[in-house]
Regions:
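Mobile cap/lid helix-loop segments that border enzyme active or cofactor-binding sites
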Residues: 1-64, 99-102
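Alpha-helical scaffold segments that form or flank carboxylate-/histidine-based iron centers
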Residues: 32-39, 64-80, 154
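Short, thiol/selenol-centered motifs that function as redox-active sites or metal-ligating centers
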Residues: 70-94, 136
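Amphipathic, charged-and-aliphatic alpha-helical interface segments
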Residues: 71-72, 120-141
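Ferredoxin-type iron-sulfur electron-transfer modules in oxidoreductases and energy-metabolism complexes
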Residues: 100-110, 150
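Acidic/His metal-coordination segments adjacent to aromatic residues that form catalytic metal sites
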Residues: 107-119
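Acidic interhelical loop/turn segments
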Residues: 138-154
Length: 154
């Protein structure tokens, strides 16, 4: 629930209604994170653009499902339950394997990277995301070299 005023789908008009129509789900549901932009629809356009280009662009080399894993992980580190739920929904949809998705979520909930049903390369990316999220000043050349050696590129 937002602490600022938002405009619900049924009360939206003009450009906001057009934007809502592009992103609404079943029963005209608009995600809360998007409704936060309802007083400034131009910021919703920017939000959608950056999200699409960062997580869902066709030129990305990291699989979309794994980008959602990173989203769940970073959201957990940031204690953002709403974001965890959002990224976990995307993970389940993109992965298409609810058992594996649930196992990933269980490991993340315990903050147990070792137990995650992921490759060593993916676990390295999880560790890298943690450093960037919690202590970016502790990023080292060794960590970057390890990422490159594992197959990640700039």
């Amino acid at each position: 629930m937002a602490w600022i005023r938002t405009v619900a789908y049924e009360n939206a008009t003009g450009d906001l209604r057009k934007l809502y129509d592009r992103i609404k789900g079943p029963d005209n549901n608009v995600d809360n994170i998007m409704m936060l932009h309802s007083l400034r629809p131009h910021s919703m356009v920017a939000h959608m653009s950056i999200y699409k280009h960062v997580l869902h662009h066709s030129n990305n080399t990291v699989p979309k499902w794994f980008l959602e894993v990173l989203g769940v992980w970073v959201s957990t580190l940031n204690s953002c339950g709403y974001c965890v739920d959002h990224h976990f929904g995307g993970l389940k949809r993109l992965l298409g394997d609810n058992s594996k998705a649930d196992a990933i979520k269980a490991g993340i909930d315990k903050r147990d990277i070792v137990s995650l049903p992921l490759t060593n390369k993916e676990k390295l990316a999880i560790r890298y995301a943690e450093v960037l999220t919690r202590t970016p000043e502790k990023t080292t050349k060794t960590l970057i070299d390890d990422m490159r050696s594992a197959g990640f590129s700039d």
